[in-house]
Amino acid sequence: MNRFDNESRRTAEARNGNGGELGAAARELSKIAVEENKRTTGLSQRAAYRKRLFEMRRGLNGEYRRNYALAAGSVFCGAVGEVLVNEYYRVEKQLRIAAAEAESLKFGRLPCFAAGEAAGSLRCAVLAKKLCELCGGAPGIGSVVEFFDEYQQNKPLTTREIQLLPAMLRRAELETLYGIVCTAGDGPLGTGRAAALQNVLAAL
């Protein structure tokens, strides 16, 4: 049996866990490879988030303005929301970083919350609500939260809600919300919401 065959046999034994020290070394290398793969995957994901944020900063004007809030909501949720529910307070630092990013994007408090709801995820909604608080909150934010709870249950807007909306929100925020509703299409917000918000905008 030549040297190549011997090496092949040892490699096969190591892979099967039958090679003594060589097998142990191979298993250790395998663990290192797995950890390295996890690490590099995480790095590539973070690089993707940074790239997306950069693209959003470039697209704050024109046609992109209607869609960037929804896109930003999903980016923040992807970066932080996965651990938010189980480790709410432990991610305070990441949330503050995300809030700073939101402010640097001139990302309004209400659109941030609406983006989470439009994404159709409870984690998104919780994250965006926390971002609202970290950005300084807003008058009547409790009413806004209740309002979006109604959204999640897909209930039609009442006349009273339509009357309260202008008092809770600035026109610019309503317009952004209307854009998010349109972007969401047949999602949790539903197409009926767009018509209701259009009526509110027309009444202002």
Model regions and ranges:
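ATP-dependent phospho-/nucleotidyl transfer catalytic cores
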Residues: 2-3, 9-116, 195-199
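Structured alpha-helical bundle/scaffold domains in large eukaryotic membrane-trafficking regulators
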Residues: 107-110, 185, 189
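Active-site activation/catalytic loop segments of kinase-like enzymes and analogous catalytic loops
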Residues: 120-160, 169-188
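Mid-to-C-terminal catalytic subdomains of enzymes
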Residues: 163
